[in-house]
Amino acid sequence: MPDDRFQHWIDASSAAGVIEPFMIPLVQGLGRFDCHLIHEDVRFSALNHEQSSSLRESRLLTDRVTLSYFWVLGAYELVRTLDQRWRTGATTLPDGFANRVAALKRRMERLRIPITKMETARRFPTDNPIAYPTISRGFGIAWHIAQDTYITRRELSDQLLDFLVDLKKGQTSKRL
């Protein structure tokens, strides 16, 4: 597990905890799974064709795709809740963060709808109704959502982690 990355998740979890204390273990759990998935993606990419085609690797790939699927669902619900709390006035966000959380929610929603409902997201009518999983050599598990358009779990996790790290900085500077 990339320890530095996991430490960033631990540190950033307090930003979500300001909004809802239960979000702290949720963010930390997402971070732990994120680091595990990155480790497994890196390990898999180092295998030769024969090794990557084994029955064991097929099972491990199924596990990675499934865990990535659940990671996306959990992360989406976290982001959706942050966005909803801000929109209903239940919490405040530092300047500029409301737009960032809304943009991240839309990005995640573009993937979440076809992987859960198996239909096209209304905002993206030309997308595929089903997002088929694939492997991006540089980023691990990805989903093909439209012609020439893929969303990787790693891309979403990087964006969520960056958002939370920056949110924590924004909350800290607001208090000073």
Which positions does each model-derived feature cover?
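Histidine-centered, metal-coordinating catalytic motifs and their short helical/loop contexts
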Residues: 99-140
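Amphipathic alpha-helical interface segments
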Residues: 1-107, 138-176
